[in-house]
Amino acid sequence: MKGATMNNNKKYNLNFFSMDDSFFTRLTRIRPNDILHIFKFISAWPIACIYRRLRRHLWLLCEYETEARDNAFYLFSYLREKQPQIDAVYAISHRGKDFYKVKSLGEVVEYGSWKHWLYYIAAEINISSQKGGKPNAAVCYALEVSGIWKNKRAFLQHGVIKDDLPFLHYKKTRMRLFSCAAKPEYEFVRDTFGYPDNYVRYLGLCRFDILHTVQADPNLILVAPTWRNYLYFIKGTPGNQSQEFLSSDYYQKWDSLINSPQFLELIHRYGKRVIFCPHRNMQSYSSLFICSDPAVSILPWEQADITDLIHQATMLITDYSSIFMDFAYMKRPILYYQF
């Protein structure tokens, strides 16, 4: 299930996403490491106003800082291959292992750089699969949601919504386009999230286009639990956080599954392999999961390409991660392990 977004290396300033705050209240929540981005924004603004005349129809796309594996990447790939006349640029850090994959397709800009700000301000439209996909989420949020700075932003999403998510309501985003993948989802978001007419569109997920062509490994099972808000925001020292996580029902249930003698016996009987890959928001605890059986691999998110795993796995075991939609789309079996 979809929840608060997070950078691949650090948590966003999620205090920004409270309801009905004034512009000045949001400003007080800007952290010291956000201050540099305020100066980047101020210095890039006048130049961007001129630069916009040179590139009137610039489309800027991005996802996470170091990744290109979701809907924004698949849209960028399509644009470069099928619609090269569109002036599309992708923002990604050179430190990401997907950097050269994107660079081979077209122009890239360093994520969070001054040039990223220049392009973000000058762009005709900013497109992302993440709500926080921008040079600096805190600064942009304060300016955009307060109405100080008006721009066009398209939200491609990275899953399918099944619940009311207040942080995605229009008054919390001011996004101009909100793409949905399923008819019931589209109707729910349109009627519940408060967007003006025609801002919510039934367009599908870009990454679904490739699902028609991928071939599964018949022996690979993906175990992919989603995250829990109460575990993501555990306070205290790392040691205290680990102890609280170890005592949680979440850890104990998933640990008991991957170490279950009955489960492992079935895996070996049918010659299967299991990859256990918790949601990125649980990755700080992934090292606490241990299984000595060679048929089970514990895969930290930073080592995983979740898109490849979705393509390769012949079966999914999850609680309610929205990637079950991908498996349903491919008509592959899904086993729900819920507690």
Where are these regions (language model features)?
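Nucleotide-activated donor-binding/catalytic signature segment of Leloir-type glycosyltransferases, i.e.
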Residues: 287-302
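Conserved active-site histidine-acidic residue motif and adjacent donor-binding/catalytic loop
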Residues: 113, 280, 300-308
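A donor-sugar binding/catalytic signature common to diverse glycosyltransferases
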Residues: 303-339
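Short, polar loop motifs at secondary-structure junctions
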Residues: 92-98, 279-283, 321-322
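Membrane-proximal basic amphipathic "stem/tether" segments
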Residues: 1-58, 63-65
